[in-house]
């Protein structure tokens, strides 16, 4: 806190008064300048730290993304095989319950703890517009991935429950119809997740200034 102290000696003339006022003004300006300098370097350090931590987190997410792309490829093959079995069972009834595979595989949750932290501590307000836009674009995509993954998990659990209704694997025509519907929903979710992963992959390979161009192309399509 900046404090202004009264003069120790009595002021006897206007000249002394103005000299005293000038000294106070200069002192205040110096104090404010020093304070602003401290704040500037604090913000600069805070921004540099945020950049380092976000860079490290996105590096981890690149590894997570590679695993998740493998997982959705496997899931796509499994769900397509399930759909083929279900359609075949409609025309040629046979025990298929044990042959159906509904799983999330080796799906990994993307990381966003650092992003959530820097949103709270004010570091984002210190970034240039293009840099902020870059991180917002990527982490909004990651947020949607998390949301869609949760919804996918719920549909897969429903499909598993239906497939387990018959211990011997002989599903009723109604069970098969329900499974076809749910499996179609799972296929759509997996396809959408694959698209989101590709968008994340594309963004992680781009430079900060290229992100607006990506969004422009997506909006045109």
Q: Which stretches of residues belong to each language-model region?
A:
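N-terminal signal-anchor/signal peptide hydrophobic helix marking the start
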Residues: 11-25, 29
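Long, hydrophobic alpha-helical segments that serve as membrane-spanning/inserting helices
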Residues: 1-15, 36-221
């Amino acid at each position: 806190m900046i404090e202004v102290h009264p003069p120790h000696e009595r002021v006897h003339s206007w000249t002394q008064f103005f000299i005293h006022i000038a000294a106070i003004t200069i002192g205040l300006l110096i104090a404010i300048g020093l304070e602003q300098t401290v704040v500037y370097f604090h913000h600069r350090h805070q921004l540099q730290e945020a950049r380092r931590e976000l860079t490290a987190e996105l590096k981890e997410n690149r590894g997570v993304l590679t695993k998740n792309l493998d997982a959705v490829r496997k899931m796509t093959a499994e769900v397509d095989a399930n759909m083929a079995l279900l359609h075949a069972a409609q025309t040629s009834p046979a025990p298929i319950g044990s042959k159906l595979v509904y799983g999330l595989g080796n799906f990994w949750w993307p990381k966003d703890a650092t992003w959530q932290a820097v949103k709270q501590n004010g570091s984002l307000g210190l970034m240039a517009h293009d840099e902020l836009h870059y991180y917002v674009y990527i982490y909004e995509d990651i947020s949607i991935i998390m949301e869609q993954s949760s919804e996918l998990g719920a549909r897969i659990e429903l499909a598993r429950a239906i497939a387990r209704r018959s211990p011997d694997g002989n599903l009723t025509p109604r069970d098969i119809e329900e499974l076809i519907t749910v499996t179609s929903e799972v296929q759509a979710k997996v396809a959408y997740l694959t698209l989101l992963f590709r968008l994340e992959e594309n963004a992680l390979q781009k430079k900060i200034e290229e992100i607006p161009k990506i969004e422009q192309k997506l909006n045109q399509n």
